[in-house]
Structure formats: structure tokens, C-alpha cells
Curated annotation (Swiss-Prot):
Residues that, per the record, bind L-glutamate: R57, F58, A59, E93, Y245, N246, F247, C248, V249, R263
This protein's encoding gene: OVA3
GO molecular function annotations of the record: ATP binding; glutamate-tRNA ligase activity; tRNA binding; zinc ion binding
InterPro entries reported for this sequence: aa-tRNA-synth_I_cd-bd, aa-tRNA-synth_I_codon-bd_sub2, aa-tRNA-synth_I_CS, aa_tRNA-synth_I_cd-bd_sf, Glu-tRNA-ligase_bac/mito, Glu/Gln-tRNA-synth, Glu/Gln-tRNA-synth_Ib_cat-dom, GluQ/Sye
Name assigned to this protein: Glutamate--tRNA ligase, chloroplastic/mitochondrial
Short motif 'KMSKS' region, span: 301-305
Amino acid sequence: MASLVYGTPWLRVRSLPELAPAFLRRRQSSLFYCSRRSFAVVACSTPVNNGGSVRVRFAPSPTGNLHVGGARTALFNYLFARSKGGKFVLRIEDTDLERSTRESEAAVLQDLSWLGLDWDEGPGVSGDFGPYRQSERNALYKQYAEKLLESGHVYRCFCSSEELVKMKENAKLKQLPPVYTGKWATASDAEIEQELEKGTPFTYRFRVPKEGSLKINDLIRGEVCWNLDTLGDFVVMRSNGQPVYNFCVTVDDATMAISHVIRAEEHLPNTLRQALIYKALKFPMPQFAHVSLILAPDRSKLSKRHGATSVGQYREMGYLPQGMVNYLALLGWGDGTENEFFTLEDLVEKFSIERVNKSGAIFDSTKLRWMNGQHLRALPNEKLTKLVGERWKSAGILTESEGSFVNEAVELLKDGIELVTDSDKVLLNLLSYPLHATLASPEAKPAVEDKLHEVAASLIAAYDSGEIPSALEEGQGAWQKWVKAFGKSLKRKGKSLFMPLRVLLTGKLHGPEMGTSIVLIYKAGSPGIVVPQAGFVSMEERFKILREIDWEALNKDESVPLESTATVST
């Protein structure tokens, strides 16, 4: 809780009304509030008086999508609560009535659920501290605003918008902070009653000591201190009766028995106002922990101009929740080892707020993609195959999402997949046959010069005789046996055998395991496997293209007509 310290002049502090004699607790107590003493509040690291239990909250505003920075804040709160056996509370801060929508709220809830961050209290989950939307707690805010008015911590301010603008302009001319300097902080009862009778609109302003400092002990940043003379009296209730953000947050955190407030460092200025309200309402102070911002590679604040920034966007791009959670956890936290692969359960076990770094964390989309691939390949085969198979069918490549072809294709191609959406490209690449483009490339020249035309002639003869179709029909074992015999007949082995076969049968110089690839290409030619519009080049069509190759022109370094290249249309 916040504490006040009295002593020698350099430690002298200003009395707050709840500590002052009763005769000073009046709205017109101008002498008391005009005293120029110094003031200091220290937020000690002591838990809220809620039985010692840990209660944290994530409080998004439903005005848009869930940003990755917000998702990381939610994750750190979730991990802290779970690691301490505490409660993770979800509160919707929808006081911005013009921008807040239920559609945005639903999207945020969906993103949190997708990440696996289930909340113990909040929308859809009953609890003892509801309601959990700020728009449904207005009566509570008004109750505490009136309490502050009665104690003298806030006062009615009847300044017009024009007057406030003029104050800011004057402060700017004098190169002073734009703090409130209006007369209503020291107005008499008579002056106030006169304005009330006229029906003049007013706000509630919080009295801020004019000198001194406020300190908190942040769990991540250590001691943080502000000079109070830079703040000025701030509004807690607007003229339309709507409470402002800092007032709502303080009342909510206190009445919901929140023990730890873990949030982004951009909220540090809010902590100054909230700490003053805590003390004025005699609320116990929670422990604060302000995490660093997530930065773009150029060290500016991550924004839309840097690409995808919302959880929903990454979900639509094919990222897994496991990969997102793992990567977000490492943006400013580590367990002290070289390990970078964590499941959500691992993170709950190892997380500690003491290991959260106060320096800005760089968001590296390449690293996120790599990490997603690690989690994708760590999935059980059945789950991975289901994900990829459904993707291939929905993308219009395969007619079915399951079966032996899907199983074998996923097993062959999974090392080249980092996102589920990558699976389209790798399968289309397997099904394509860009032979002419490959033969025309400089990289293929050594293979062409190694009597590739002779291997092609022998291969065509073996296909026409039925040897190749027969071996492929029997499967991987029979195909390997045939390749070995074919190599002996040509007196070739190793690279001198396998490279020509890869080029001539797949149309490429590189790719996944050759034998399995060729067997799968043959199987893809069976009826009902590949969607006709997918651009698949069957084994029969490949040999037709092989027969039309002008090997003499190739050996003379003449250009190959690229219009005859067989590729998949994407």
C-alpha cells in the first residue's frame, strides 16, 4: 500500500485529507490545499489484502483487433497467474462508447481462446467481482467519485473548453507543462453553488500536490519516480457523467482485488494518476510490473506499416497458436538457458516475472515463422496430416483431405513447411514438371553434359516396355530395386545416376527424397486424387515431354523453347 513519510524539511510531505483533522475536510479548504509543502508516495511491494492470493487481469479495449503486444501482455499475466496458482481475470474496458463494439470484443475473446489463454473470471465466466465490462460498472464509479468529492480529493471544475485551451496556450508560451491552473481548485462554496444554480457543466478534477514526487517499486524496472509539479489536477469524471480511464481502472483493480498489474510500459504515466487515486480512496496498492514495448526491426514502435500486427492476421496466415505463444513469450523473457522451444505448459512451469527484460523486444517475423515450423512438425502425425490435408482440399489441389496419398505426401513434404499455408506451394511444386526451364538453367549444364540424353533414351525405353509403370505400381521397394538394376545397366551409381533421374522424372535439380517423390507423382495420376485444374503433370505426360526434347540443340547451348515448359499454374 502507499505510505507517507514525515520528517525534516527535505523529507517534508503534504498531508492528505484522510489524515487531516475533520475541520480541514471541506470543499472550500483552500488554505490547506494551497500550502506549498512537498509530497511523496511510495508504492511498496506488498500484495493486496485478499488473503495473499495472486489475482491479475488483462483489460483490452474492444476498439479493434488484438495487437501482438496486447497478446503478449495477456500471456505474461496468464503465465504469472498459473505459475503462482492465482486467478487470471479478463475485463473489458469499453468506456470509449463511440469506438467500442461488441464485434471487436468477440474478436478479442476469440483470439485469446485461440491462443489457449483461458480466463478464470470475465465475459462468459462467472465470478465474485463482476460485472466484467466497464460499461456495466458506472454506478460503482459514480459512488467512488462522490466519495472523493466529499473527502475533498476532487472538486468541481466549471472551466469551459475555451478557458482550458487558453491555459494550454499560455503554458506553451511560457515553456511550462500544460497543467491545470484554473480557479476552481480553490473556489468557495458560494462560487460553486452559483455555477450549480446556473446549470453550468462541470467535471470532477483530482487535486494533485503541487510539489514533491511519487515513487513506485516496479517489479521489472525497479524504482520509478515522477515529479508531481508536471502533472496538474486531472479530470476523473467528464461533464457528461462519464468516468475517465484512469479512474475506472483504479476502482476496478481495487474492487476486483487485483494483486499485480502487469502491463505495457506505455501505461507508466497512467500509474502516476492511479497511485494518487489509490491513496485518496484508501485502497491498498497492487504491485506494478511494466513490460517493454515490442519494436520493429528498425527499433520503432511496431505498427501496421511493418506488416501484420494482430493475432487474427497471423491466424489467417496459417500460424499455429503454439508457435505464436512460444514466440511472444520470448519477446522480453527467457528461462536463462539456450532453449527456445516451449509449450504453454512448459512456460507455466518456468515463467517468472523477475526474468522479464525491461529493454525493448524486436519483433522478427522470420524467427516467428521458423518457430512456427518447429511447432508444426512437433504435432502428432495424425493432427499434422489432418491440418495439411484439409488445407490441400480447401485450396483446390486435392479432391479429398485424407487417404494414403495425403499421408505419404505430408510425411515427405513436412520438412519444407513452416506454415500450414506453405503446404500449397510444396505440393504444387511436387506436382509440377518445369523440365525445359530446368534444362535451360546454367545449374543444369553439368548434368546435361554428362550424357543426359543417353539416360533419357534408356528411361523412355524402360517406360515404354512397362518396366517403370510396373515398378511404380508395386511401390517404394520395387522402385528402389528397379533403380539399382537400371544403374547397373548404364554403369552409373550415386550422383551420376540419381541426378539424371531426378531431372528427367521430376523436372527439377533439387527436392525432397527422390524415390518417394517419384512414387507419389505416379500415384497422383490415379483417378480422383488431384483436382484437374491443379495443373498436375502426370507420369505419362512427362514421358511425352521427354520424347520431344531436342537434345542436339541443348548440347550446342541453344535456347530451349520455354513455351513448352510444363509447370503448375498457381
